[in-house]
Amino acid sequence: MKNLFLFMAITLVGLGGCSEKRSQPLAIDNSLTQEEIAAGVLSPEVMWKMGRVGLASLSPDASRLLYTVTWYNMQENRGVTAIYVRDAASGEVAQLTDFSSNNSDPKWNADGSKIYFLSDRSGSSQIWEMAADGQNPRQLS
C-alpha cells in the first residue's frame, strides 16, 4: 500500500512539471540574417520568420479591423498568436495582446467598445473581453 501511495505521489509531481503555462512572453526574432538577404531565396527558414495572418473582424462602424498574426520561434519550437487592430483611415496598426499567451478569434461587441476573444493566458483556452484599445482584459469563462 505504501508503494502505491509513493508511486502516485511521484506520478503527480512528475505530471505537475509537464504544465505548459507560460508567464514570460515568447521571444520573436523575425529579422533576416545577412546570408538570407544575400541569397535572395524564399527558403523554409525565411518563411518561418514571416507572421501568419489569421482571422479578421471589421468593427461595427467599419473604421477598424481586428486580425490575428501567429509568430514562430524556431529555437523554442513553438508559436504564439497575437491580436492587432488597424485603423482604416490612417492605416495605423496597434498590437493589442503580447506574446505571453495565444489569443485568437477576436470579435467586436455591437457598439465597437469591447473585443471578445479566446485566450490561453489562464492555462486553457477561455473566453475573454478587453476594451477596444486592448486595456483591461477580463476572463469571462
Segments (PLM) and residue ranges:
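A flexible loop/linker signature enriched in serine peptidases of the S9 family
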Residues: 25, 69-82, 97-103, 118-128, ...
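Conserved beta-strand position repeated once per blade in WD40 beta-propeller domains
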Residues: 55, 105-107
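A short helix->beta-strand "capping" segment at the edge of beta-propeller domains
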Residues: 30-53
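C-terminal motif of bacterial Sec signal peptides marking the signal peptidase cleavage site
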Residues: 14-17
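Short loop/turn segments that connect beta-strands within beta-propeller blades
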Residues: 87-91, 131-135
